[in-house]
A protein has these predicted regions:
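Conserved alpha-helical scaffold segments that buttress catalytic/binding sites
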Residues: 2-341
Length: 341
């Protein structure tokens, strides 16, 4: 049965590699605590009572990717990313006290693994994910979600919208692909944003770094006809005299609130993912964007990464890459070291 596993301190401790003279982030993060709540239930007040500002959770699944005829493997990113994050040094730059590690979704394989069966299962995943996101946002916290496929953008956007009083979300997606495929195909990782738009939860949608080689003939016309959808093509970035961060800041200048940030790891060169690319952003480009951010994003979703793919490819550094993105996102809105008492 599909469910959400809430982590205890014991779950966290099992992932920490202790070393004399060092303190790890995992020794300072918070876990969910509600002794009076029924087992497995997440209470909004209990989330509000936590001193942590950020709530970390995982969606280790690749059903949405497979439903889009992609290569399985994105379910492997969460554990690797979490272990990498928990073993970062706790210090004055980031202590770990800022983070509540909530847990991860446990999603069973569908009995019917046909394309239709997989797409039906994605609908089930949507219904499982959005209420948890809704509670986190309702509690005034910022969810950091590690996927999983980009199909999960739809329930994350829905949950964030409902949790913020029903306000439509405005989202910028760093991605080589638009994920605006036809909803009539059935749910999969290629139509997360068209689903969010069609469901009324998404207002502005901006794609940064979209690759011209991976869009169908009708997409440019579709974008041009919709004033709320904007794309900055990666090929235009390559020809621009401005830096990536300058183009980014100009591109998101009119992004309204509440807003969400999506990072598809297939936009970054040589990161193992469902659609790994040889041409894309450098990891430090994305780190620069995150560390220079001063916008209060309502959520961060990092998706499509993997440590092991069904075709046999492996990369043990993916978890560390994701951990960098998580910590950069948090550090950006912390007081600079020079401003701390």
């Amino acid at each position: 049965m599909d469910s959400f596993k809430i982590y205890t301190q014991s779950d966290i401790d099992l992932l920490i590699s202790e070393r004399v003279g060092e303190e790890k982030l995992g020794q300072h993060v918070h876990v969910y605590d509600c002794p009076t709540c029924p087992e497995g239930e997440i209470d909004i007040q209990a989330l509000m009572d936590s001193p942590a500002r950020y709530v970390l959770l995982g969606i280790p699944e690749d059903i949405g990717v497979r439903a889009n005829l992609g290569i399985a493997g994105t379910k492997t990113a969460w554990n690797s990313a979490l272990k990498a994050l928990l073993n970062i040094q706790s210090n004055l730059f980031l202590s770990g006290e800022e983070i509540l590690v909530l847990g991860h979704f446990e999603i069973e394989e569908p009995i019917d693994t046909s394309l239709q069966g997989l797409r039906k299962k994605v609908n089930t995943i949507d219904a499982l994910v959005y209420p948890i996101i809704q509670k986190i946002v309702n509690a005034g916290k910022i969810p950091i979600v590690i996927g999983g496929g980009h199909n999960n953008a739809a329930p994350i956007i829905a949950g964030a919208s409902l949790g913020s009083g029903g306000h439509k979300m405005n989202v910028v997606n760093i991605d080589a692909h638009a994920d605006l495929r036809d909803r009539a195909e059935g749910r999969h990782s290629g139509n997360g944003f068209s689903t969010a738009l069609g469901s009324g939860y998404l207002n502005q949608y901006k794609i940064f770094g979209l690759h011209q080689n991976y869009i169908n003939q009708s997409l440019p016309d579709y974008i041009a006809a919709n004033q709320n959808i904007k794309a900055f093509y990666f090929e235009d970035l390559l020809q621009s005299p401005k830096s990536v961060i300058e183009n980014w800041n100009e591109f998101i200048a009119d992004l309204q609130e509440p807003s969400g940030l999506e990072i598809d790891l297939d936009s970054i060169e040589k990161v193992l993912s469902s659609a790994q690319t040889s041409s894309g952003f450098q990891l430090n480009d994305i780190r620069n964007i995150l560390l220079c951010n001063r916008r209060n994003f309502a959520y961060l979703h990092v998706c499509e990464g993997a440590t092991e793919m069904a075709d046999g490819k492996t990369d043990s550094t993916t978890g560390k890459t994701i951990a960098y993105l998580i910590t950069d996102f948090i550090k950006a809105l912390q007081p600079h070291i020079s401003q701390k008492p």
